[in-house]
């Protein structure tokens, strides 16, 4: 099975270390353009753009990067409850047309009640999923060309329609992640690709089986994806050293403050991430080559695959064997790590999209002694 592998645009900041200004990267439009173009050149099929108050707006960033990329797809957030489904569908169709079919959409219900309240949304966890289901029902139908009348518990629209359709037919794909039963029910009923964060394979297997069964009960099939960080180096020893360096500036107070902030979330997925490390820096390898150190201070995806290229590829294949065909990866800093993943990991994967063909002056490395083209090294 060929794999769809995406990268990540760090619109909420970037750097060489977590939880410290040491090695912090100035993230501006020029830097995001560099990361997007590096991802495209290395053969990533698309990029995920995060959402939330700590991030630049994902739609505006994606739109700004369309003209400076050619094949790269942009996975941007849909936020039910804070925008009308009709307006969101219109924006989605426009982004898909502007990008000539390179727009993908990620349904994000939100997991931080404090942040949601600041955005004007005062629904409980269960109510948010009710509203998300209504939103998605309307959004999908509009993009598929229907005229929609809908009167739900949370959303009502009358004679809603789009005048300009998307490029992708019947509509752009819809991604979604969530670990609660309400989230899984929504995925089974309406989404195209269900995402999970990088839990150990046995936990992921159980979760995917639940969603697969729920979808089958609806007469549907759902694709699967996973969100992971990656720390890949020429040797596994070097990769683990890089993992240790990434959190080398974290002190106990920084970790405790981060975990206290994340504990207020009502996201089941966030609770599952926190349980993997327990807020402690010891015993962070929770499964072979799966490291939970990033989740000590980062919300959302908090685990990384660590190792040399062949080892990380083996771990990715273990997830692929569970039925996962889409891998959304990232690494710190995101510019350099995009190249490392492309150079050290991709030769060991069966990719759905290959690196962008380049007409370079010299693509074989620096000439040796002004005379010899460097010899080709076989991958092992």
UniProtKB/Swiss-Prot annotation:
GO terms for biological process: alkanesulfonate catabolic process. It catalyses: an alkanesulfonate + FMNH2 + O2 = an aldehyde + FMN + sulfite + H2O + 2 H(+). InterPro entries: Alkanesulphonate_mOase_FMN-dep, Luciferase-like_dom, Luciferase-like_sf, SsuD_RutA_monooxygenase. It is an enzyme of class 1 (oxidoreductase). Gene3D superfamilies: Luciferase-like domain. Pfam families: Bac_luciferase. The keyword Oxidoreductase applies. Its EC number is 1.14.14.5. GO terms for molecular function: alkanesulfonate monooxygenase activity. It comes from the Bacteria. Keywords: Flavoprotein, FMN, Monooxygenase, Oxidoreductase. Belongs to the SsuD family. FMNH(2) which is absolutely required for this enzymatic reaction, is provided by SsuE. Catalyzes the desulfonation of aliphatic sulfonates. Homotetramer. This is Alkanesulfonate monooxygenase. It comes from Pectobacterium carotovorum subsp. carotovorum (strain PC1).
């Amino acid at each position: 099975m060929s794999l769809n592998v995406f990268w990540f645009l760090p619109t909420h900041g970037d750097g060489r270390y977590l939880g410290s200004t040491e090695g912090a990267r100035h993230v501006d439009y020029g830097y995001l353009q560099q990361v997007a173009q590096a991802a495209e050149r290395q053969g990533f099929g698309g990029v995920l753009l995060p959402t939330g108050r700590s991030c630049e707006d994902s739609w505006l960033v994606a739109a700004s990067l369309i003209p400076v990329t050619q094949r790269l797809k942009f996975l941007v957030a849909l936020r039910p409850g804070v925008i009308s489904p009709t307006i969101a569908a219109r924006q989605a169709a426009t982004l898909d047309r502007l990008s000539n079919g390179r727009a993908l959409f990620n349904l994000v219900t939100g997991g931080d009640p404090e942040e949601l309240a600041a955005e004007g949304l005062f629904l409980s966890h269960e109510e948010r999923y009710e509203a998300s289901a209504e939103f998605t029902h309307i959004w999908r139908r509009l993009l598929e060309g229907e005229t929609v009348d809908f009167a739900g518990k949370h959303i009502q629209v009358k004679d809603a329609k789009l005048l300009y359709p998307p490029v992708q037919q019947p509509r752009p794909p819809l991604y979604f992640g969530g670990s609660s039963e309400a989230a899984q029910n929504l995925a089974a009923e309406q989404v195209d690709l269900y995402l999970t964060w990088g839990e150990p394979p046995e936990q992921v297997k159980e979760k995917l089986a639940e969603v697969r069964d729920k979808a089958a009960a609806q007469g549907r099939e759902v694709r699967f994806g996973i969100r992971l960080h990656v720390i890949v180096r020429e040797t596994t020893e070097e990769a683990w050293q890089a993992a240790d360096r990434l959190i080398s500036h974290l002190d106990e107070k920084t970790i405790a403050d981060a975990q206290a902030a994340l504990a207020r979330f009502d996201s089941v997925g966030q609770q599952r991430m926190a349980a993997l490390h327990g807020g402690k820096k010891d015993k962070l390898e929770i499964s072979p080559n799966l490291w939970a150190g990033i989740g000590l201070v980062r919300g959302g995806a908090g685990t990384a695959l660590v190792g040399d290229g062949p080892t990380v590829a083996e771990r990715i294949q273990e997830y692929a064997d569970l039925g996962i065909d889409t891998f959304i990866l990232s690494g710190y800093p995101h510019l350099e790590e995009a190249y490392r993943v492309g150079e050290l990991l991709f030769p060991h994967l069966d990719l759905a999209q290959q690196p962008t063909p380049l007409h370079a002056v010299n693509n074989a490395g620096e000439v040796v002694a002004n005379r010899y083209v460097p010899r080709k090294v076989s991958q092992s």
